[in-house]
Amino acid sequence: MSLLAGFAVFFAEIGMAIYNRVHAYPFGIYGAERVGKTTLARQLQTRGEVPDIQKRTKGVQSSSRKLIKIDGDVRTIRSSDVGGQAIYWKQWESDMKKRNVQYIIFMIDHRHLNKNFNMDNQLAWQYLVDVILKKRWSNGKKKKEKDYPVAIGIWANKSDLWIDGYDFKGEPSKHPIFEPFNMGIQQLNEIGIPCHKYVVSAKSDSEMVYRGITTMIKDY
């Protein structure tokens, strides 16, 4: 009996490994312009140092599959590169609805720490939160349970540029960079959507990126 159980576990693990490689988890990657969404998309496609990207993304690009490998764990995700200019924010909702996005990565940078009057990150975040909290899509169609994301990651990007510039010794998730987003996080938590805070450099640290993706899928 134990031998049969062992075989069952073995084949179950193989089946799960195949599923994780073949099944693509739909991710939505959103945020204000120039926070590093295109850099993240490039990092997920080709692992390594990403060169500076000057061209701005317009609208919603076609989604594509990305293979995520770290510590022997293999996952496949599907994501689109979506413009962060305010004129494209409405297309975040379209992307979420069309692809039935399960996981969202909302990217921010440190501009609101450098300049208190800069509200780019906060306005984009509140827009996304409002879209998710609404019980109906903008076309009036009522949302179903599957239309809500499983989890949201708030990724503080460009850490290589700002992490050492602030006298902060606590957990990265407690860093002041996340403070303006806590109210939205609480609102999402209240409807059962967990939010995961993460500090990352999409440009230069592929391990941080891949580990962040895998953690979201595993934990939520």
Predicted feature residues:
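Switch I (effector-binding) loop of TRAFAC-class P-loop GTPase G-domains
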Residues: 45-78, 84-89
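Inter-motif core of Ras-like GTPase G domains
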Residues: 89-132
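Canonical P-loop GTPase G-domain recognition
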Residues: 161-220
